[in-house]
Every structure is written in C-alpha cells, then in structure tokens.
Amino acid sequence: MGDTAEDQDDRAMMEAEGVTSFSELLMFSDGVLSSSSDHQPEGNVGDGGEDSLGFVFSGKTGSRMLCFSGGYQNDDESLFLEPSVPTSGVSDLDPSCIKIDCRNSNDACTVDKSTKSSTKKRTGTGNGQESDQNRKPGKKGKRNQEKSSVGIAKVRKERLGERIAALQQLVSPYGKTDAASVLHEAMGYIKFLQDQIQVLCSPYLINHSLDGGVVTGDVMAAMKAKDLRSRGLCLVPVSSTVHVENSNGADFWSPATMGHTTSPSLPQGF
C-alpha cells in the first residue's frame, strides 16, 4: 500500500525537525505528537487511536502515554490505558507500558504500615506492662531495705543513748546531759585516773642498784630474791593480820600505832 498525502506530510515534518529514532522522539517536545494527533479524524479524538507513524495514543478519558509493544498494536484493549482511579479491585498492570499506577500499592503499603504500627503498639504496651511488673518487686525490695535500715538506726540510737546516760551518771551525775558534754567530762576523768595511777605506782617502779656497781649473775639472783622488799613490799603471814581485819587501814599505818603493831611471832628476816 502506498503512503497517503498525510503520511508524507508527517514524515517530511519529522525529517525537518531532525527526528530519526524513537528515543529522539521521546526526548523531543510534545509538538510532534500534538501535530500528528491533529490529523486524526474527529470521531477518534475521544477514544484515542494510532497515528501515521505507528504510535499509540489514548483519548481524553485516559492518560496520555505511549506503548512500544508491537504485538499489541492491533489489540484495542491493550492500546488504551485504564483510567487513574480504578472502579473496583486491584488491576494487573501491563509490564510493557511505562505508566505504573501506584495508588493500589500505596493502599497496600498503608495497610501494612498500619498493621505493623498496631502490632508495635501492642508489643509496646505488653513490654510496658511486663516492665512495670518487673519493677514492682524491685521497689518493694528497696522499701523493705529502707524500713530495715531505719529500724537498725533506731536501735543503734537507743543503745547509744543508754550508754551516754550511763557514762553521764559516772563522770558528772549532776552536770550536763548532752552527748558532747558527757564525752568531754569522761575524757577529763580518764586523764585524772591515769595521773593518779602513775603517782601511786612511781615508788614501786624504781629499780635500785647495789652501790652503783656492776650487776653480776650472783647479784641478780639476790635481787630477784629481794625484789618485793626492794619495792617496799613484804610477805606477812595471814595469822599476823587477823587483828587488822576489823580495824581501819589508815589508822593501822599511822605513826602512833606503828610501834604497838609489831608481833613477836614475826620472824627476824621480815
């Protein structure tokens, strides 16, 4: 079949524009397609059709897209794309077409996201309940520990108060009763007792040497034998101390009674 006058005009116009391939046609402006579509008959404008160059286009009701599959050029159902809003259900998309209707896929994605978010919320609430249940024993344990520590502190405070009161009765029964004053008085009292013990023990702690000479082994034995006498002490039989049992010790050691307390039964060595 020979080319018609309209086909020759379209080819001449494409050659004038420098379009030689399909890629250049896609990158080119819509002027060529619009010019080619102007030559179509008015009855086919609403339904779409095929121009003289073999390109498929859709009408006003559908999306204006191209389909490059040569096997579907004679099939009216595959030539025209479905409208953007489907009437019902999810339609299968033609892999040979450029246009991809993602509205249904977005709906599916939103459904998946909503289900995931709901499951996350459920799991989150479950984990929160479990965490609360796990935290409750810890709080109870802390409260029990605090109560036990408070009870121990009270017992220690009571014991300390009792000891302070007993110490206050010893050092200053009619003085101050606060802990600081009682401890201060106790320190002074202890120092006084230490000084008294040192004064009373000083005569008995002096070591006397024999004439200031060198101490030999024999002298050491004699010093050990006279150790008590050298320290001002002596051994007295129990029978000689019977008359001192009912008397006052201070009067017994007074100078007035020292001469009358000598017993003839005492040995000469004492």
Curated annotation (Swiss-Prot):
The entry describes its oligomerization and partners as: Homodimer.
Gene Ontology CC annotation, any one: nucleus
Major place of localization? nucleus
A single Gene Ontology MF term assigned here is:
DNA-binding transcription factor activity
Tell me which species this is from. Arabidopsis thaliana
Question: Which keywords fit this entry according to its UniProt record?
Answer: DNA-binding, Nucleus, Transcription, Transcription regulation
Full protein name: Transcription factor bHLH113
Keyword Manganese applies:
no
Q: Which InterPro entries match?
A: bHLH95_bHLH, bHLH_dom, HLH_DNA-bd_sf, IND-like
Biological process annotations from GO: regulation of DNA-templated transcription
The secretion signal range is: none
Per the record, the coiled-coil ranges are none
Q: Does the keyword Ligase apply?
A: no
Q: Which domain of life is it from?
A: Eukaryota
Q: Which residues form the bHLH domain?
A: 144-193
Q: Which PANTHER family match?
A: TRANSCRIPTION FACTOR BHLH113, TRANSCRIPTION FACTOR BHLH83-RELATED
Q: Where in the cell is it found?
A: Nucleus
Q: Where is this region: Disordered?
A: 109-153
